[in-house]
């Protein structure tokens, strides 16, 4: 069979088209891979910072042997957990036992979809961004409850129940605070919320317009992250390790990862909702606007936005780490009373007050 020149060119064009499709497919997943790499690095930095700050508060030496200044200690711990034996409970539900950590990790990772780290640097600028985060974050306690129930251990089961009760108690005040911010910004999009704060400069940040909501959001975020003084689901003195008691190896490492991912997500949302996101309200912004047509300056602006966002997030991280070594753990009844009898009425009153001001200003 003889193939003429036209057929050869047609075959080559189809081959090039398929090759282009593969290249476009790789390019489309590049932002996701970049974000995952950035999240991994951020978690390692947070673990190192927590150990160094905790050591400084307790007047002792922190990690110093694994790498320079102990920077590789988190990698060493993760590698150790990776090669540990994966022990399964003999009388537990093995399928639920294995699925629980995965649900918790995936639900937290999905929250990064709607977080704008910088100007035009967000994976999904959705019109319901903040509500999507609240909905996704409500899935994580289901994974913790599954982990506790499937372990066939009383300590694990109690820890799972505590995690579910704590999440339900503090999710509602958190939602009311987000609703108040959305009313001020006239949008549920995280990008629109940041841009609404940038209109009035530094004093347009929602921390000044919603101080009560900020405090409620801060406390509720710490409770959602299960940080001291709200770490009742894994209280060592009462429940050994809570829902993590029967876990070992990589599954235990996933729960360890979830706690720091939760802390990172909460810090970023505090920054986006109350601290102006990537905006700093200093003269360099007008300088970048003047040279907006330059692509290099646009990349520099995006990089500066990411740096500013992360710097503000680290402020919240420092506060949460300091609180861990400052306040004692609460009892379960105190935790529930704080959520239902104190934070819920305050957040509801703040929402009604914000709604009234918005109606009057129309």
From Swiss-Prot:
UniProt EC number: 7.1.1.-
Pfam families attached to this UniProt entry: NADHdh
Keywords recorded for this protein, A-Z: Chloroplast, Membrane, NAD, NADP, Plastid, Plastoquinone, Quinone, Thylakoid, Translocase, Transmembrane, Transmembrane helix
Membrane topology: Multi-pass membrane protein
Keyword NADP: yes
Localisation per UniProt entry: Plastid, Chloroplast thylakoid membrane
Keyword Metal-binding: no
Molecular function via GO: oxidoreductase activity, acting on NAD(P)H, quinone or similar compound as acceptor; quinone binding
Catalysed reactions, as listed in the record: a plastoquinone + NADH + (n+1) H(+)(in) = a plastoquinol + NAD(+) + n H(+)(out); a plastoquinone + NADPH + (n+1) H(+)(in) = a plastoquinol + NADP(+) + n H(+)(out)
One cellular component term from this protein's GO annotations in UniProt: chloroplast thylakoid membrane
Enzyme class, spelled out: translocase
Residue stretches spanning the membrane: 29-49, 103-123, 128-148, 164-184, 202-222, 247-267, 303-323, 335-355
GO biological process terms held by the UniProt record: aerobic respiration; photosynthesis, light reaction
Main subcellular location of this protein, as a coarse class: plastid
Family per record: Belongs to the complex I subunit 1 family.
Entry-linked HAMAP family: NDH1_NuoH (MF_01350)
Quaternary data: NDH is composed of at least 16 different subunits, 5 of which are encoded in the nucleus.
Function as written in the Swiss-Prot or TrEMBL entry: NDH shuttles electrons from NAD(P)H:plastoquinone, via FMN and iron-sulfur (Fe-S) centers, to quinones in the photosynthetic chain and possibly in a chloroplast respiratory chain. The immediate electron acceptor for the enzyme in this species is believed to be plastoquinone. Couples the redox reaction to proton translocation, and thus conserves the redox energy in a proton gradient.
Record's protein name: NAD(P)H-quinone oxidoreductase subunit 1, chloroplastic
Gene: ndhA
């Amino acid at each position: 069979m003889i193939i003429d020149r036209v057929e050869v060119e047609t075959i080559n064009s189809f081959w090039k088209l398929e090759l282009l499709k593969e290249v476009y497919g790789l390019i489309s997943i590049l932002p996701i891979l970049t974000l995952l790499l950035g999240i991994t690095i951020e978690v390692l930095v947070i673990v190192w910072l927590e150990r160094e700050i905790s050591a400084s508060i307790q007047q002792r030496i922190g990690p110093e042997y694994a790498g320079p200044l102990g920077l590789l200690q988190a990698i060493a711990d993760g590698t150790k957990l990776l090669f540990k034996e994966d022990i399964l409970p003999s009388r537990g539900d093995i399928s639920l036992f294995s699925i629980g950590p995965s649900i918790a990790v995936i639900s937290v990772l999905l929250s990064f979809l709607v977080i704008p780290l910088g100007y035009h640097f967000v994976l999904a600028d959705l019109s319901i961004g903040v509500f999507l985060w609240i909905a996704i974050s409500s899935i994580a306690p289901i994974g913790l409850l599954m982990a506790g129930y499937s372990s066939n251990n009383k300590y694990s089961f109690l820890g799972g129940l505590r995690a579910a009760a704590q999440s339900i108690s503090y999710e509602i005040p958190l939602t009311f605070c987000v609703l108040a911010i959305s009313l001020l910004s006239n949008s549920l999009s995280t990008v629109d919320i940041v841009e609404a704060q940038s209109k009035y400069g530094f004093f347009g940040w929602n921390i000044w317009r919603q101080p009560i909501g900020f405090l409620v959001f801060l406390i509720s975020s710490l409770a959602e992250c299960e940080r001291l003084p709200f770490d009742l689901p894994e209280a060592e003195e009462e429940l050994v390790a809570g829902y993590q008691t029967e876990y070992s190896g990589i599954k235990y490492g996933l729960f360890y990862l979830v706690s720091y991912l939760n802390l990172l997500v909460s810090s970023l949302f505090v920054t986006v909702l109350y601290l102006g996101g990537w905006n700093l309200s200093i003269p360099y912004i007008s300088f970048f606007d003047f040279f907006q047509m330059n692509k290099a300056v646009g990349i520099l602006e995006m990089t500066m936005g990411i740096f500013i966002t992360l710097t503000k997030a680290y402020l919240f991280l420092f506060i949460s780490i300091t609180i861990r070594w400052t306040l004692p753990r609460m009892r379960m009844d105190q935790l529930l009373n704080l959520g239902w009898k104190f934070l819920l009425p305050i957040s509801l009153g703040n929402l009604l007050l914000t709604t009234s001001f918005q109606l009057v200003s129309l």
